[in-house]
């Protein structure tokens, strides 16, 4: 069968054609639900405010294997810089182009195709298969996976293993899987001063001057050494805003946004304590608020990682490398329930970029990997 005609390719194209810029779903979940319903899944839409979610399940017993993913995509950017229209899926030289091709409509299609093939071969499989799909992963992540998990937890419905379809691969399909993620903590700091004329500094109090030594020291602090699973905790200033835009006005306040990506060697509470102690040491007048974006998690050796290793080896012929580097995913909302979480998806070289694309043959291989994982865990 030509690669252009793979079932996974056709479904990926159908999903890309729906311009589901976050938090829109644009019918993607309905398309998936129709396919899953036809093979015995119970479909439960969960709509929270502007976000469309879907919980689909086949089976009533444990263990529960869950495919997790998102139908929303990031904005296209300058459309004139795309080789082809971003929501007109187009195959060129063996690559499928379109917004969401790699992140993550290709993975969603591979999940559905793998499940259809698995159920056809194993209609009486062990346990249950589930899909947790949201349209809020690329946005503020308020009404998406976290709300679905809250609903499941309230009725004591547990996930045993979760496979998130985020584009984990770097150079070739399956060379890297993510078996954990660092925690993420954001600080929003306002350093207060007194606004005034730059010619009369004795009548004002410049918050930028006051904050500069603090920020310099904060940016050079050593937080931890990491461990065998996680790199050392990192700190980055993301935004600094102060002033009126005029050259003759001392600002009355300085706003700073910063972020920690932290290992299991520290906790959010420890980071907060150290930052606020430094603020006090510099005798700053300030307000600060904190946003907890997710706890660090790790899935070590066990059935899920073993099954994934076997699948990638069987389909691609090489060994995978479990890593915890990179950004956050919705896996951070699933892991605290006790589920084992892993991420496996396409090559991530073009995600969020102009001319996002995925290798068509990789989609077929990804579907095969997902199917083997199901066989390893539920047969």
From Swiss-Prot:
Pathway: Amino-acid biosynthesis; L-lysine biosynthesis via DAP pathway; LL-2,6-diaminopimelate from (S)-tetrahydrodipicolinate (succinylase route): step 3/3. The keyword Hydrolase applies. Zn(2+) 2 binds at residues 103, 138, 352. Keywords: Amino-acid biosynthesis, Cobalt, Diaminopimelate biosynthesis, Hydrolase, Lysine biosynthesis, Metal-binding, Zinc. Binds 2 Zn(2+) or Co(2+) ions per subunit. It comes from the Bacteria. Its EC number is 3.5.1.18. Pfam families: M20_dimer, Peptidase_M20. Zn(2+) 1 binds at residues 70, 103, 166. The active site is at 72, 137 (proton acceptor). It is an enzyme of class 3 (hydrolase). Its cofactor is Zn(2+); Co(2+). GO terms for biological process: diaminopimelate biosynthetic process; L-arginine biosynthetic process; lysine biosynthetic process via diaminopimelate. GO terms for molecular function: acetylornithine deacetylase activity; cobalt ion binding; succinyl-diaminopimelate desuccinylase activity; zinc ion binding. It catalyses: N-succinyl-(2S,6S)-2,6-diaminopimelate + H2O = (2S,6S)-2,6-diaminopimelate + succinate. The keyword Amino-acid biosynthesis applies. Belongs to the peptidase M20A family. DapE subfamily. NCBIfam families: dapE_proteo (TIGR01246), PRK13009.1 (NF009557). Homodimer. Catalyzes the hydrolysis of N-succinyl-L,L-diaminopimelic acid (SDAP), forming succinate and LL-2,6-diaminopimelate (DAP), an intermediate involved in the bacterial biosynthesis of lysine and meso-diaminopimelic acid, an essential component of bacterial cell walls. This is Succinyl-diaminopimelate desuccinylase. It comes from Shewanella baltica (strain OS155 / ATCC BAA-1091). The gene is dapE.
């Amino acid at each position: 069968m030509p690669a252009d005609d793979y079932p996974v390719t056709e479904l990926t194209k159908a999903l890309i054609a729906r311009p589901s810029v976050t938090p829109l779903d644009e019918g993607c979940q309905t398309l998936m639900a129709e396919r899953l319903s036809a093979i015995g899944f119970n479909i439960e839409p969960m709509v929270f405010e502007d976000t469309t979610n879907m919980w689909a399940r086949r089976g009533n017993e444990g263990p529960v294997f869950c495919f997790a993913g998102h139908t929303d995509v990031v904005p296209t950017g300058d459309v004139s810089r795309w080789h082809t229209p971003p929501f007109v899926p187009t195959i060129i030289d063996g690559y499928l182009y379109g917004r969401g091709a790699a992140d993550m409509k290709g993975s969603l299609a591979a999940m559905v195709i793998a499940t259809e093939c698995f159920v056809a071969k194993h209609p009486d499989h062990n346990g249950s298969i589930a899909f947790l799909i949201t349209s809020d992963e690329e946005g503020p992540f308020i009404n998406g996976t976290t709300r679905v998990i809250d609903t499941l937890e309230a009725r004591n419905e547990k996930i045993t293993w979760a496979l998130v379809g985020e584009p984990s691969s770097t150079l070739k399909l399956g060379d890297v899987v993510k078996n954990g993620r660092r925690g993420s903590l954001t600080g929003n700091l306002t350093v207060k001063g007194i606004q005034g004329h730059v010619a009369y500094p004795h009548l004002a109090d410049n918050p930028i001057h006051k904050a500069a030594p603090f920020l310099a020291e904060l940016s050079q602090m050593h937080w931890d050494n990491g461990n065998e699973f996680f790199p050392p905790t990192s700190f980055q200033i993301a935004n600094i805003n102060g002033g009126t835009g005029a050259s003759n006005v001392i600002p009355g306040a300085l706003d700073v946004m910063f972020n920690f990506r932290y290992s299991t060697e520290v906790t959010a509470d420890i980071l907060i304590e150290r930052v606020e102690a430094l603020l006090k040491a510099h005798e700053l007048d300030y307000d600060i608020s904190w946003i907890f974006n997710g706890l660090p998690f790790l899935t070590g050796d066990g059935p899920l990682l073993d099954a994934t290793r076997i699948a990638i080896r069987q389909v691609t012929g090489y060994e995978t490398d479990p890593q915890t580097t990179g950004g956050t995913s919705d896996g951070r909302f699933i892991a605290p329930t006790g589920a084992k979480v892993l991420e496996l998806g396409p090559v991530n070289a073009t995600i969020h970029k102009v001319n996002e694309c995925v290798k068509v043959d990789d989609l077929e291989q990804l579907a095969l990997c997902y199917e083997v994982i199901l066989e390893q865990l539920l047969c």
